[in-house]
Amino acid sequence: MEEKQEKSRIDRQFDFIREIDKEKFITRQTFLSDAKRRENDAEHAWHMAVMTLLLSEYANEEIDVLRVLSMLLIHDLVEIDAGDTYAYDEEGKQTQRVREVKAADRIYGILPEDQGEKLRELWEEFEEAQTPEVKFAHVMDNVQPAMLNDYTEGKDWIAKGVRLSQILERNAHTAEGSQKLWDYAYTNFIEPNVKTGKIKDDTK
């Protein structure tokens, strides 16, 4: 029996590149700006990457922008297997870590070992949320959907009955990455929708 030839480095790289095309099929809850359909993970990653290029000057601390961009582009790839966990899905969050670790093992494992380990480390760094780069990346991950929710007149917030307390809890650490951007997002994207009742104010 002929021994199976081990894949070359470039073969494994293209296997991974083809695999991550599946991220385009992972639907998130946030609607696009025309409010006609929900965005997918790849669109979300692209949007956050461009935001980072433009808004990194507002980070609380000096950050490595390339590292932030790298994290934002790869951290949701695990959702190809694990699926998207909605921000306010408390039941889904209970199994999220287990699902995503298993997905990370498979997906990053497609790559040559050195590159797979590098991307896996970036993903773990994002999950631990300790470094200045990750803190800023989380700002992007929270502000981008808030902006789109506001732009679509609170369509998803209304559909899900989202409460202000939920938003504040999710964003409890957003200001640690950028006080300026959190203040801007709250004033321009969240507070107006509280005033119009699109976000239920349960904090009083």
Predicted feature descriptions by range:
Residues 1-204:
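Alpha-helical, largely C-terminal catalytic domains
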